[in-house]
Amino acid sequence: PALLRGAASCDLPTIGVSGGPMLNGQHQGDTIGSGTGVWKLDADLNAGLISEDDFVEAEISMSRSKGHCMTMGTASTMASMVESLGMALPHNAAIPAVDARRYSNAYLSGKRIVEMVKEDLIMSKIITKESFENAIKVNGAVGGSTNAVIHMAAIAGRMEIDLTLDDWERCGKEVPTLVNLQPSGTYLMEDFYYAGGLPAVLNRLLDKGLLYGEALTVNGKTIKENNSKSVCWNDDVIRTFDNPLTKDGGIKVLKGNIAPDGAILKPSAASPHLMQHTGKAVVFESIEEFHNKIHDPNLDVDENSILVLKNCGPKGYPGMAEVGN
């Protein structure tokens, strides 16, 4: 996302090439995901259910190739956003980092960027308000990270395109979560690629008339031209609209006295019984206070408590550090 922001400021011909996800983690006969697995193992370690040696062994089994995390976390989400914005060649989002097709994608992208320079196909000719709305809907369909909201807002700001939380709420209402990936579901990015990758998701959204099919992409073709014939090879990894992972896929925007300008929630990864919940607020004034107190056995907290972390936004801390897990 930072590279896209820089490219947007320059408004030059640009093409995105992601590094690709790691291979699936394999540990003691089970498939384990990177971020999702780490948080569970960390909780088990702190609870005394596993030893530190067990933790390290699982971590080694989890990160067994180069590439970014293979769950639908920030990296996989933003790779999907780049492709759905039209800023990368088809399949860029999901090809594993060590797959030969990842290198082919990079080679073809290198050839294509030379042609884009000759065609003067600059970024502002590709990314529009419509392509942002396409990406928001794709984020819902893949169960994408809440981090997409701040990254997409920053890219839109550089391009002087008005993108608000209201757009996320409006566009997200129409889309169920179709992609059955951790942390919302079962599978990982390697499985997603073999099942058809992002083109298969885009095709399903196009079939329902949910995307602006005429949105332009970096190869000079439209989203519809690139993806309308894409095939899904595994309906459990990429679900149909008749059998979604969750019916409410889009990012939800919450407003109230605690967050008058809006707070966001990823319904596909949320526990259904917490959608309406009342509990005691346990407030931490800083990340440092949170880390110092969260494992204190004397902390007045239980399973119904609501943890509130202050002074941890993109400006104040800075960087909006991830500590919620």
Question: For the regions a protein language model found, what residue spans apply to each?
Answer:
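Short beta-alpha junctions and helix-cap segments that line functional grooves
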Residues: 2-4
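Catalytic or ion-coupling anion/metal-binding cores of large enzyme and transporter domains
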Residues: 6-11, 17, 21-325
